[in-house]
Amino acid sequence: MDFELNEEQRMFRDSLRKFLDAEVRPLDDRWGDLEMTAERAKPLLKMLIPWGYADSEGILAGGSDPIIGCVQSEELSATFPGLSGMSGITSGAASLIAASAHPDLARRLVAPLSHADLIGCIATTEPEAGSDPSGIRSRAERKGDHWVINGAKTWISNGSVADIAVVLAQTDPAKGPLGFRHFVIDRRESPFDSREIQTIGLRSFPTSQMFFNDVEVPETNVLGGWSSERVSPERAFQRTLSLFSHARAGTGMMAVGIARRAYEIALKYVQIRKQFGKEIIRHQLVAAMVAEMATEIDAARLLCNRAYLALRRGRADVEASMAKWYATEAAVKVASTAIQCMGANGLATENRVERCLRDARMLTMPDGTTQIQKLIIGRALTGKSAIR
């Protein structure tokens, strides 16, 4: 396996990086640590469309080349991580709808989501069902030719700004996880309430509570079962688990980008800052910290690349969990080390690196905590579950 980018991939990366540095980085400086609105987000997302973001390929963008998808995610996350998250979630919703929705619904929604005319979200987590998705309590009841949905979701990315929500709900509690179905809720036609959750980091990547009170959707808004090529409705829970694997790989790659941003800021600083008559990079302990940061980033990137490649071949639960666990924890470690390299200056908000730490810390929780990832890996390696 060649661990270096090929010529086409390098050219894409270099062109994308040039565009992001010139056009998007100033926007991150202005809005990256502020609450995002739909009105502000849509023009920003539209800027990314020529580069393959927010398309119906979903989290693993990049067409036939998953490494291009890795490059896209890392570069945008290193530049404007909040926008990277919003783009990934919207494209994930578009991907689900494109693959499993009624053809009429797919024709109506996929293009607007892909063109950033609409923002999407995927609503799974609930107040009593975080790391354990089998505990979903939101109910969907059939009434004639439509469904009525009641329940609450929490910690939903894009939830407060989403026009389109893909919501997991229970249709038959007696069936357990086999009763789960995904429903597409168009907020313009079936309104629901939401509330922004204030967080320490990724403030421009909305995180929300969502409330569904007698929300009606037509039968055609149920995902799955519309042709022999589409996922059976009975497989909704397996689809949910597969979604988690894709999201974990994407979250891992976001972490790589954030870690790289912190590293680059610190690397520049230690080559300029002088103490005891020389640049601080020439002090052994500082040089060691720089080496550790670079190694952590490379290791995390390789794990994420492997997960992206594996997901293109099918289910890759272990690879995705390894990537998510290692990359997010590495990002926290790298950002903290970057602050240490810069001393008191690392604590100043004007130097940006402290936000890298706050942003990185946000990523160890979603899509299953670090501890849940380790349990998933352990179960796969031994065949024995430490969860149940």
Feature locations, PLM:
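A short, Trp-centered hydrophobic/proline-enriched beta-strand micro-motif
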Residues: A116-T125, L168
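Amphipathic, small/basic residue-rich leader segments at the start of a protein or domain
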Residues: M1-G88, R108, P112-H115, L381-R388
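Glycine-rich phosphate/cofactor-binding loops in nucleotide/flavin-utilizing enzymes
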Residues: D2, V71-Q72, G92, P233, ...
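C-terminal helix-coil-helix/basic helical segment that borders enzyme active sites and/or dimer interfaces
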Residues: R25-E35, L267, Q271-K278, A294-Y326, ...
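A short core secondary-structure module
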Residues: D145, N150-R195
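A structural signal for short hydrophobic beta-strand segments in well-ordered beta-sheet cores
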Residues: S138-E141
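N-terminal glycine-rich flavin-associated loop
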Residues: S84-D104, G130
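Glycine-rich beta->alpha junctions and the first turn(s) of the following alpha-helix
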Residues: F3-L5, D193-D298, L363, R388
